[in-house]
Regions:
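Short beta-strand scaffold segments in enzyme catalytic cores
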Residues: 27-35, 153-154
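Conserved residues at the C-terminal ends of beta-strands
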Residues: 44, 71, 99
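A short, polar/charged loop-to-alpha-helix boundary motif
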Residues: 44-57, 171-175
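Mobile, glycine- and charge-enriched loop segments
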Residues: 53-78
Length: 176
């Protein structure tokens, strides 16, 4: 498998958390050693272990010298769970490939910096566009502190939503 395929697998795993992780982001992680996936995980639910720790918990062998592909920069602070950076360092993982940068002020580059200071090779912005697409709601909220709102409004050319008699007509559909 290629680096892109490992990150695509991490993205696929992250999507399993859709609808469950709020207010946290969806994150997936894949641990690779000698060209084989030896662990994988995703953030399943707010308050539970993050993707990196779930991937570590699923290890089939030692992660020493392995590479972890993660869709979002690993956290480096204590919250409902301990920092993922600590777990990565403890496992002696040699390389971390990060998709999206975490805009949360508690992380925002600090996670990558801690890993580098521990002698770990860090690659950032790998398939960033694809990884960023996982969490537009999280990114918007964490940077603006306002809700992410999507609205769809359909009307006829004269600005109406029904006929003069009040009867509804289909004015939108799948193509919209």
């Amino acid at each position: 498998m290629t680096d892109q395929e490992y990150m695509l697998r991490a993205i696929q795993l992250a999507k399993k958390g859709e609808g469950w992780t709020n207010p946290n982001p969806m994150v997936g992680a894949v641990i690779v050693k000698d060209g084989r996936i030896i662990g994988e995980g995703y953030h399943k639910k707010c308050g539970e272990l993050h993707a990196e720790r779930n991937a570590i918990a699923s290890l089939t062998e030692s992660a020493e010298g392995a590479t972890i592909y993660v869709t979002l920069e690993p956290c480096c602070h204590y919250g409902k769970t301990p920092p993922c950076t600590e777990a990565i360092i403890e496992q002696k993982i040699k390389k971390v490939v990060i998709g999206s940068r975490d805009p949360n002020p508690k992380v925002a580059g600090k996670g990558a910096q801690i890993l580098r200071e521990s002698g770990i090779t860090v690659v950032q912005d790998f398939m960033r566009e694809e990884c960023d697409r996982l969490n537009p709601v999280f990114f918007h909220y964490i940077t603006t502190k306002t809700p992410y709102v999507v609205m769809k409004y359909a009307m006829t050319l004269d600005g109406k939503i029904a006929t003069k008699t009040g009867a509804s007509k289909w004015i939108t559909g799948e193509p919209a």
